[in-house]
Curated annotation (Swiss-Prot):
It comes from the Bacteria. The PRC barrel domain binds ribosomal protein uS19. Coiled coil: none annotated. Residues 91-164 form the PRC barrel domain. GO terms for molecular function: ribosome binding. This is Ribosome maturation factor RimM. It is found in: Cytoplasm. Its main location: cytoplasm. Gene3D superfamilies: PRC-barrel domain, RimM. GO terms for cellular component: cytoplasm; ribosome.
């Protein structure tokens, strides 16, 4: 199975650097010089030549892609890795696609619903949960609200504020 670790953005300068939208928790290792990444759509493998951070944005150059014109053709290309080729992750490591279908429960074990998706790429990640009442609930994916993810046990533990999953008294019903 392939997993997207980044998306190539716009060129930066005239020497073949591109901005990269990072989608991995270890970019310094994943994009180290010499790292080989597959592309989607398939444009052949890309080998990282240089990597540096500039104002919070990762800038990469690739071997054989040496100027702005050449790198412009990579815009919006997804950089992917094959999960089967990856080293065994930590016991508590997970990938976003593994959350789909997990039970969403409170810290006391009360069922809240089922995880539908994890939206990434915005200001912060957002967990999409289909509540027990069928409504879709968006939960900011931050530790105070999502204290634990347990893929092996098939659950995501949530500590939602009052009213997020249960209607508050006085709210109109849909």
């Amino acid at each position: 199975m392939e997993y997207v670790v980044a998306r190539v953005g716009r060129p930066h300068g005239v020497r073949g650097e591109v901005t990269v939208e990072v989608r991995t928790d270890d970019p310094d290792t994943r994009f180290a010089p010499g790292a080989v990444l597959r592309t989607d759509p398939d444009r052949g493998p890309l080998t990282v030549a240089t990597a540096r951070w500039h104002n919070g944005t990762l800038l990469l150059t690739f071997q054989g892609v040496e100027d702005r014109t050449a790198v412009e053709g990579l815009r919006n290309t997804r950089l992917v890795v094959d999960l089967d080729d990856e080293a065994d992750p930590d016991d508590d490591a997970w990938y976003p696609h593994q959350l789909q279908g997990l039970a969403a429960v409170t810290t006391t074990g009360t069922p809240l619903g089922t995880v539908k998706d994890l939206l990434t790429g915005g200001a912060q990640d957002v967990l999409v949960v289909t509540g027990t009442d069928g409504r879709e609930v968006l939960v900011p994916f931050v530790t105070p609200l999502v204290p634990r993810v347990d893929v092996k046990r098939g659950k995501v533990v949530l500590s939602p504020p009052g009213g997020l999953f249960v209607e508050l008294p006085g709210e109109p019903e849909e």
